[in-house]
Amino acid sequence: MSLLDYFKTKKEPSTAVTAKERLQIIVAHQRGERGAPDYFPQMKQEIIEVIRKYVQVGPDQVSVQLEQTDDNFSVLELNVTLPEQS
């Protein structure tokens, strides 16, 4: 029986599974922003604008996140996907 299973085509994940995964990502993102200070969205936008002055990047290539730990520390994480140089 396992030999027949090997040759069967694998099913693509259903749209319900894909939608559930996307919803989980959105909920996790919103939970992460729940403890962020009020000025965080404006600060995030200003950081992205400064990066765009020097490097041509799209809004989806810059990620800014604020993580707060139990030890009363805040970590500002900034990830930028830089374009390849020609």
Swiss-Prot record:
InterPro entries: MinE, MinE_sf
Pfam families, per the entry: MinE
Claim: Hydrolase is one of the keywords in the record: no
Keywords: Cell cycle, Cell division
GO biological process: cell division; regulation of division septum assembly
HAMAP family linked: MinE (MF_00262)
Family: Belongs to the MinE family.
Record function comment: Prevents the cell division inhibition by proteins MinC and MinD at internal division sites while permitting inhibition at polar sites. This ensures cell division at the proper site by restricting the formation of a division septum at the midpoint of the long axis of the cell.
Name of the protein: Cell division topological specificity factor
The gene coding this protein: minE
